[in-house]
Amino acid sequence: MLKLDHISKSFDGVSVLNDISLEVQDGEIVSILGPSGCGKTTLLNLILGITDTDEGTIYYQEEDITKLSMEKRDFNIVFQDYALFPNLNVYQNIVYGIRNKPGLSTAEEVDALIDLLELRAHLDKKIEQLSGGQKQRVALARTMVMKPKILLLDEPLSALDGVIKESIKDKIKTISRQFHLTTIIVTHDPEEALTLSDRVLIIEHGKISQYDTPAQIVHSPQNDFVRKFILNQLVIKRDNILTLFGAAPLTAGKAV
């Protein structure tokens, strides 16, 4: 389990996160959702250990993460820009992190991931030859060969559209379930968060507005910010989302 206990963070005297407390269960998919500048990327960086908290403690399996080695944290991230190596081909990118590191993925496990993420036909290609969806799948494969227990994804769908976006969503769900990963996703898109996650953390101005299941957020938004941000931004897909979670479709100006 990952636990955040009264986390606060400021930069240059400006509060970015204020008293954030939550728990993420093993194997759970959680999205951190909010508008630009709300603190969601800072929260991801704190979990990853890139940035230190000003106040509060982050625990992984009941241990303070600042006291754990990077190996014991078992965290890995797929960055928004993929961070792939342009001078290497797809296969070389995938296995780059496990070179000379016994105990990580075997050749058979790497092959299984390549097939799961449908990359077999692209192994000899350079990164510049790939589409956005293919790059995202390579980045996922490169991360998964490291056998993380917690997978962090920074805006994994922001550069994708339509069928490609839905395909990557399916891959994220499949990987998370098959490998029993705790998966934490940063996104600004309510539709992505609601359809991809077991629970959604909604942040406004560095504070928790609601932390709940997608169905509960749709049925019972806890405040006006959640109601407006979630429902108004869904626009065309709004009625489909509400139907998916068993709520009556909204009309303009009405809330659940």
Per-region residue spans from a language model:
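ABC ATPase "signature
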Residues: 211-212, 220
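Conserved ABC ATPase "signature" region
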Residues: 105-122, 173-174
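A short, proline-enriched helix->beta-strand linker immediately N-terminal to the Walker B motif
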Residues: 145-149
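Conserved ABC ATPase "signature" C-loop
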Residues: 205-206
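The feature captures the beta-strand-to-loop junction immediately N-terminal to the Walker
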Residues: 33-35
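Conserved ABC ATPase signature
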Residues: 126-130, 134
